[in-house]
Amino acid sequence: MSLKSKLTKIQKLWLYYFPCDRILAKRICKSTVNTTVAFIFCLIPKITAHLGAAPAMLPMISVIVHPGRRVGGTIHGAIYCITGLIFGLAYAIFGRFLAQRCLGSSWHELTEAQQHVLHYKRYEAGLAILAVFEVIMLFFHGWMRSVSHYYFGIVFPLFVVVHFAFMDPLNETAGTIAKAYSTPFYLGIAMSIFWNLVLFPEWGTTYLGNTTIDAMNELHKSIDYSINFFIAVDPHNSSQLYSRDPVSLGKLLKMKSLISSKVNNCRVVLHECIYEFTYAYVSPTKLKPIISTLENLTVFINGLVNTCQLEFILLARHDNKLRPDDVAALTLPKNKEISFANAEKLLKVIDKLHPVIYSLHRTMSECMYIAKLVLAHAFDVKVSRVHSCSMFKDGNFPTFSNNANNLPNDVDIQNKINDLKQALEECKAKFKSEMLSFDIDIMSPSDEMFLLSSFLLNFRQTADSTLVIMESVKDILVKRQIQEKKGWLRGKRLWFLVLTNYETFSIWLKGDRNSVTENDTLKGTFNGNTNGFAHDTVIRRPDYEENELLSQKVSSNKNIVKDDASLDLPMTSEPKGNSSSTSDTSSSPLTLTKTTTFGTNRTSRRQGRFSFMSMLISIDKFCEVSHPHFRFGFQVAIALMLASFPMFIPKTRQWYIDYRGTWIGFVCILCLEPSVGGTFWVFFLRAVGVIFGAAWGYLSYVAAVNQTNPYLETVITVFGAIPGFYYLLGTPYVKAAIIEIISIYIVMLAAILPSQDDILTSFAKRCLAVGYGGGVALIVQVFFFPLKAREQLNEEISFVCGCISEMELLYATGLEGEQVASSMSEEKYKKIEKISKSAKEALARATAYKGLTRQEPRLKGEYTELENVFTQVIFIQKQIIERIDTISLLRKQNGSAVIEEFNSVVYPYRRQMVGSISCLMRALQEAFINKTPLPQFLPSARIAHRRLINKVRQTLRIRYPGQISNLSDKARKPNEGDYADGKDEDDDDNEGLVMKMNRRGQANTTANPHEYVLKEKFLSWNASSAASEEIIEYIEELLNLTKILVGVNEFKYGFLSRPLYEDWAAEAVTGFDNFINGKSNPMNTRRNRTPFDGTSIISEGNESLQSTNSNESQISPDSTRSYEPECPVAYEKNDNPAALNLLRIASHKAGQNADGLPKTFRNRAFSITSTSGQLSSLSRHSTLGNADPNYLNDDDESSDDDLPLALKMVLSHMKEKKD
């Protein structure tokens, strides 16, 4: 191996473990230069004389307010730091003033040692006042850090000023203290801003344009790839219109998380721009509507990708050669409803609609490309960043160079908008005309139609969102052209966005991201880029958030209180002295006057009691909401007072000062976290940082040979600061890196500046500070109100389950049969959007907690296996929330025909399905939070959803009986077992779940059913049904994973402990003669060892969509052992039981000429078994309401091969026992 190849290998290995891009390298360079210059200023005596009594604060503040971020982030950090300095300095001077008053008039004449000897009591009282002020400051510091991590940039400088000022001698004046803790701080902040603007400036507005273009590139690519994947079923077809083959499913699924992070980063950078002065033609706020549209576009693209995933399952592409990333990405449960749909029908429809979809896709892709070009020109982004689409064979996309200043003049935006509108209308018309050519069987509600509707609705909404983007781009282009006509000098303006409206001011004051940690605040960048490193701390979700978002009882109670408070007693008689206006006062509320003394006193007492009770309720609510703030406030106060109590005791104060007690408190405050983290791991990292920094400072000082060579000393410190800034800016270990960098300069300056300590003593005292201060912080955080990551993980997963239940209830409208004007109001959608955002943040926290749990000590065995289960749980919850977002936005945009027109008929079925889902999710929520097993019985949402689909299909047949019968004559004859067999009502009507339809007025309905089912609202319901099937399937999988984590309650004894009828059915088949004569011996059934062994026993042959006996298992959520039948058939007394062929029953083989088992016996045997996943295709087909005999290949209806698979399994078990 040559030297060059070895170096290349070493370089790749280095970049793998320590990734670094160009932006990070520039930021490290800026920060290192800034801190080095600050250290050089401390070495110059003339500059040090102007810095006051604490010149070592200059390098420290240069690290805290570092320039290694964008301009907006630096200004943001500077504003927060200055705010903390001002209030901290004022608070410290006030506390010292009161302490000096206790010393009397001699406070400025005597030293602290003399005060200790001459005025001990006064000196002790003054230190007691300082201690009280210190405790109040520490509690406020912890409270503010717990309220919002944004405020860490304010309260940390406040702590530094107050803590260090209280350590200074009490005989120093207020002017000396103000100079010591203002000049170096303000100089360090000014230097950071200077180097941020001079050396590699990063303007947020320019970065905003680049980020928006990058996000639109990914969105554009995802749209093209997903549409190509869906309609290009046969990539080898010569009539294929695309020049590229479809990408793999794995790559398509990975794009969802990528586009989500890109769009979120756009919003973050937009909020960061409010701190900047921008000199440009167009204000950055012009991108706000585009970014909002991109967020909605992300939801529709996720819907497109999900439909591609369903199509992949339906077309059974697993029979073909799969790419490795396809196999890795397709981690789906086996019992997918879509796998039982008819692929031929879907392919037939796609083949018809292929040209229509392609035409709109091509126009939409071209408009997206033009929009990116215009935005790149408007915000001075290099045109080379814009990616064009080259997957169209007849595509003619223009390309431009970077110096194309006349770019907008070559593009007619309005013409492109008109083309897109026309293409959208043509797509709707052609789609309607093409679909009208099919028979009603294809148009009826089915899994194929659900899949197609989901794709078409998301596709159209994507085109509508592109149209909205084009309108916004047109306004930006017009604004840019107007400003350009004024010339370069007058055209550009200075934009400052912080005080433009209340929203930007609120963001500036409080921030807009609840998931920001203190590390992100110190780092100054909120894009979550940690270069592959895991977070060491996570922000904890406020306890009151769950009550605000998920507690329906609280909101209802508020309404009750409000209503009760507004009730007034009616007047029964007219008060004295008010003889006039009788008609007015007779109907008015009771008015109490001064003459009614008794009533006034009674009312005043009631009002007093009500006010007192209201005050108690408010206090109780405040304490409940502020519980985590109290907890961390007490933690900070206890830890810091344990670490620094000697500074407030007269006898130990001087000793504590000599041992650098301020360092102990400084290390202790940085080791305390209001977040959940690996406490021992974080303490270890920060201890290593302090020791390494102090050792590097010692090395630098020794290399300078006792300050004889300060140049070499400075150069060596640079090599120690570079890795520190790398860990500060490029990894989540921010506070460990801060302590390491500060320790380098603090240890050196303690020996360089006039003091009694040499360099070795300073190194030892710094190590003592991390051992004592960090140890105290560790003890307090472990034993005083500890937070455990594994408990927080369960809480977050439980919270997400509650969010899903609440979103499902908000998504459902009209569950009581009432008439609703809109199926999704704006208010409900805003609530769903808010809950969805909180749930996604909770999932991000759960992912971090999952990694942190490995660092915690555990006594219950290894955590590795449980971590894999939690990984799957988080993934499934994310998929559920993603699909609820999609269907909610689709319903808001298009409505729902079933809710708005059929709700009076189908609402009991909708209510049962929604209630089942909500019940399941609430049961999971309580199981996770309480760590209790699941109950024995849980409702089946899958069956409820199938019944809803069947009822909608039946309602359509009742609404249009004549048209459907005419269309059905051309089609095949329905199967005998089909649900849609012409009956007006099914068996569930006898249970009172469905209301009879009023036949009056329906006979006059002559509308074409094709016209109805092609309405946008009905397509929206079809699309939501496809997503609802997926949601139910994921919920069942989540239920199974929950059983692994918390277990499930099972009946150990009694009738429900095992399926007794299974033994009866087995004996009826194997020993019919003995069974008839009453000589049967009950067999001992074997119970499953684990509730998840279903996949091991269902292994009789390969899976096939055309097979009559499907072997895929469907695990019902009702119990861990038994499986609920999908289609139980009641026993009919009119059937003739004499048609049994005992020979065939005993042989288990289908005869050629003999009659088989009667249909009633087979159905009855199926209904009494406890396995639903092992059904014949006839039963599955009957449930779905499809009646295609060619598709099912059910040639012999009475064949013995149609016996339930569960019955065959029992027979196989019996043979094994005999063997």
Curated annotation (Swiss-Prot):
It holds the Pfam family FUSC_2. InterPro entries: ArAE_2_N, Brefeldin_A-sensitivity_4, IVT-Associated, Memb_transporter_dom. The chain crosses the membrane at residues 37-57, 75-95, 124-144, 147-167, 184-204, 630-650, 664-684, 688-705, 710-730, 733-753, 767-787, 797-817. GO terms for cellular component: endoplasmic reticulum; membrane. Residues 58-74, 145-146, 205-629, 685-687, 731-732, 788-796 are extracellular. Keywords: Membrane, Phosphoprotein, Transmembrane, Transmembrane helix. Residues 575-602 have a biased composition (Low complexity). It is found in: Membrane. Coiled coil: none annotated. Residues 567-602, 967-990, 1096-1125 are annotated as: Disordered. The modification Phosphoserine is found at residues 1167, 1198-1199. It is a multi-pass membrane protein. Residues 1-36, 96-123, 168-183, 651-663, 706-709, 754-766, 818-1219 are cytoplasmic. The modification Phosphotyrosine is found at residue 1191. Residues 1096-1122 have a biased composition (Polar residues). Residues 969-982 have a biased composition (Basic and acidic residues). Present with 1080 molecules/cell in log phase SD medium. This is Uncharacterized membrane protein YGL140C. It comes from Saccharomyces cerevisiae (strain ATCC 204508 / S288c) (Baker's yeast). The lineage of its organism: Eukaryota, Fungi, Dikarya, Ascomycota, Saccharomycotina.
